[in-house]
Amino acid sequence: IFYSDPQSESVENYMSFKYSIDQALKICPNPDLMISAGDTTQNGYKSTEWEACFDVMGDYYAKYPTATVAGNHEMKGDWNFVSFAQRFNMSGANTGYPQFDRTMGYFEYGDAIFVILNGEVTPADKKAEIMKKELQWCKSVLDASDKKWRIVMTHAGPYTSNHDPMDVRDYYINDSEYSLDAMGVDLFLNGHDHIYIRSTVKNDIKVNTGDGTTYLTGGTVGNKFYEYIPA
């Protein structure tokens, strides 16, 4: 089960998260894993929000293996993602930035490899350098795997349809050596937009499924929605 952006603050508001997952479980009653594109909280530094989330969803986290991404709201007031890292046991990365390495990781499942990146790194004047290290690490992981399907996850994607686009295109699309195209990524999962969109793209041109990377932006399992903004 793939979902994104619970982004709530209280037990009452997290009930939307629970109801959404309950509905998904009616369709897929025995999932092997759950994967989230992030923004679990509204304010990552507030322990009360994390406690509210786990009060409502703790049994689900305990029952179903879950991999989740660090979003921009996990970063709020917690630039090094301390609260996130204390609650989710990621396998880790090797970029030379330990405060961010602990928010990333990878795992293999069936005939697929999943790589989790963090595009919400700071400070802004170091972001290009940090993202280059992330993508170099990502490529090394993908190249070392013999799995057929390459899946990359992060919070904000390069193709967006809402009011708050993030500055990630230079890293995921425009870098000739470490772009998603160059790494042969089959599926890119992200959230952030609170709108469901999907397309298959190669070299910034829409193509048939299987001829490029399929970009899938999850909607939201929370109660905050945005209007779709056409490209």
Language model features with spans:
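Non-catalytic positions within long, well-ordered alpha-helices that form the structural scaffold/packing
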Residues: 25-26, 143, 181
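Mobile, glycine- and charge-enriched loop segments
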Residues: 1-7, 134-171
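N-terminal active-site segment of His-dependent metallophosphoesterases
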Residues: 1-47
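Extended active-site neighborhood of metal-dependent phosphoesterases/phosphodiesterases
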Residues: 48-146, 166-167, 175-176, 187, ...
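A short, flexible beta-alpha/helix-coil linker loop
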Residues: 7-9, 40-41, 120-124, 157-160
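Extracytoplasmic/periplasmic solute-binding protein
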Residues: 17-20, 74, 155
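Active-site neighborhood of phospho(di)ester-bond hydrolases with catalytic His/Asp-centered motifs
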Residues: 2-4, 33-39, 64-72, 117-118, ...
